[in-house]
Structure formats: C-alpha cells, structure tokens
Amino acid sequence: MDSTSETRSGSWLSVIALALAAFIFNTTEFVPVGLLSDIGHSFEMPTSQVGLMLTIYAWVVSLASLPMMLLTRNIERRKLLVGVFLLFIASHVLSGLAWSFQVLMLSRIGIAFAHAVFWAITASLAVRVAPPGQQAKALGLLATGTTLAMVLGIPLGRVVGEALGWRTTFMAIAGLSVLTLLYLARSLPLLPSQNSGSLRSLPMLFRRPALVCLYVLTVVVISAQFTAYSYIEPFAKQVAQMSGEATTLLLLLFGGAGIFGSILFSRYSEAFPRGFLLAAILALGSSLALLLPLSAQPTWLMALSLLWGMSIMCFGLAQQSRVLRLASDATDVAMALFSGLYNVGIGAGALLGSVVSERMGLASIGNVGAALALAGLLLALFAALRYAEALKSTSL
C-alpha cells in the first residue's frame, strides 16, 4: 500500500473529519422536519404539502446514488469529497435565498445529488482510514456524527429558524460546511478509488439472497420510521399540544438517544447479531404504536422519544454493518444501493405520512408506522432463520 495514500496505522483524525461531514449532511437532510410549520407559513402551504420536500429529496437521492457512484468511481476520494461539498454549499446558499417553494425544492435537489455521492462512499472510507482492528469503532464514530446531527443539528436548526427565520438556518449550514470542507481537505489522506465496483457488480450482488433481504428490510423499516418522524413537529404541536420549546426538547431527546444506540451497537451487535436487530425493530414498532396513547402526557412522550431514538440508530448501524460485510468486494456499489434504498424508505414514509395526515389525521401517523414496523419484524425473523449462516456475524 502506498504510504502517500493510506497509512498502515490509519488515522482517527481522518475518521473524525468524516464524522464531522456526516454531522453536516444529516443535519441538512432532516432539518426541515423541525421547520415544516415555518416554511409552510412563508409560502402559505399546509405542512402536509411542505413535508413532501422530504419525499422529493429522498427519492432524488435514491435515484442518483448508484448512477453518481458509477460516474465517479475512478475519482480519487478526497478530491471527490471536495467537489461534493462545493455543490452542497452552493445549494444551501440558494436555499437561503429561495423566493418561492419551487426554488427551494430546486436547491434541495442540488443538495440531494451531493448527498447521494457522500453516503455512497463515506462508510467504506471510514473503514479504510481507521486504525487496524478499529473498523467497527470507526463506523460507530461516523454514527456519532449522524447522532449529533439529531442531538444538536436539528434542534439547533429549529431554534435558529424560530429566532431568525428558517432561511438563516440554511445559510448557517452553508457557513459550517465551508469550515468542514477546509478540515476535510487538510486531514484526509489521498484515497484512490478502491473496491468501488461497477455495473458488473450488480448481478453479483443481487445473486446474494441475504443481501437482497437486508435491502428489502431497510425499505420497510425506514418507511415505518418516516411515516411518523417526518411529521413529528406538527404532531407534537397539534396533537400533543406541546409548546415550541417542548417540541424542540422532544427532538433533542430523540437525537440524544441515538448516542446510546451507537454505544449499544458497539458493545452488543457482534455478540448478539440476530437478537440485536430483532430487538431494535421491536423497540421501534413499540415506540410508534405508543406515540398516540402517550401524546396526552408530554413527559411520557419525551421518555418514549428516548426508546425511539435508540432503536432507529441501532437498526441503521446493524444494517450498514451487515451490508459492508456481505459485499466486501464491491463496497461502494453495495453502499450506494443501501443509501438509495434507505432514501426510498424515507421518501415512501414521508409520502405515506402526508397521505395519512390528510386522510386520517396527524394522530394516526404512529399507528400506520407501527403496522409497517410489524411487517419489518416478520421479515427480519424470516431472514434470521433462512439466512442464519450468512447473517451470523456483523464483524467487518
């Protein structure tokens, strides 16, 4: 291995840089969740329609992930990340200046293209630059960046949006992205494309039934999650009758719980690979089912958000780790598919949540999400029994 590109010892500094980038990308993907009401007020639109921002964004990511990964598969990875961030920053500036909802959506599509490339390559890069034997911890640190977006990024974005307007939130993300870009360019080593795969990898990957089952499970469970989570802000304000400050705290607790989820993953996922995933899905489904019954008691609803946040983080990490293991010979293609299908789930969930909100009322989003989670649990049980040998370990 060339010492100018990747050191044998690995670098925690490089992993931290990628975790910081993950914080930025996850903040901007979900920050509209906390700003739906304000954006809707600016453009005189109901939150159920504004929420379709999440669907369009997610589906652009899902459609673009694999093509963009293939188009960029031969580009040195540090250079590619710099280009991704330049597009990301320019699109956020346009978001802050958006004079119509259509322009805002156009800017979000630009961000979605950057997102598609970023998440297709980042997990495998974190594994590559990590010190030997520390790959699982590197993924955990990457997840911490994701979690901090929930803990600090989304609630902070909501606080800034309420105080200074939602446009300021997007401009602030652009500014933070510039600093992150400088940090990435300085800390990452040269990273030639490696095991990125090609179109020839697709038939090979789809001939692995355990991997295909993981992909289907991801779509089902993430759809369940985002049927409810996409509209948690209007749910908290309109159904649970919570104040703006309490709603921000609810989002903060949900995100903070993800930290504990990543700790649980690091400690127990390899020891109990099948049970860990099943427990995560069961906890997620239970959280969604209890959303409406506990909405009359804001304190209990906040406590529930802790279980909810831990469960979805555990699920996401377990799935990501298994995909990397089952497709170690084509990691970028496999992760592009995973990212794309994850976003299919986000978009489907946000769309379903919009339909449920308009047809059945906001109060029903948790129950519908719980029904999908139950379907996911049954699929996970089938996979655990049918593909026990392939899924017996999540080690990388």
Swiss-Prot record:
SUPFAM superfamilies reported for this sequence: MFS general substrate transporter (SSF103473)
Alphabetic keyword roster: Cell inner membrane, Cell membrane, Membrane, Sugar transport, Transmembrane, Transmembrane helix, Transport
Compartment list: Cell inner membrane
Gene Ontology terms: biological process: transmembrane transport
Membrane topology: Multi-pass membrane protein
Domain of life: Bacteria
Keyword Cytoplasm carried by entry: no
Gene Ontology CC, one term: plasma membrane
Spans through the membrane: 15-35, 50-70, 81-101, 103-123, 136-156, 170-190, 209-229, 246-266, 276-296, 298-318, 333-353, 365-385
One Pfam family named in its UniProt record: MFS_1
Transport recorded as keyword: yes
Family: Belongs to the major facilitator superfamily. SotB (TC 2.A.1.2) family.
PANTHER family: PURINE EFFLUX PUMP PBUE, SUGAR EFFLUX TRANSPORTER
Function noted in UniProt: Involved in the efflux of sugars. The physiological role may be the reduction of the intracellular concentration of toxic sugars or sugar metabolites.
The protein's name in its UniProt record: Probable sugar efflux transporter
Species for this entry: Pseudomonas aeruginosa (strain ATCC 15692 / DSM 22644 / CIP 104116 / JCM 14847 / LMG 12228 / 1C / PRS 101 / PAO1)
Gene, per the UniProt record: sotB
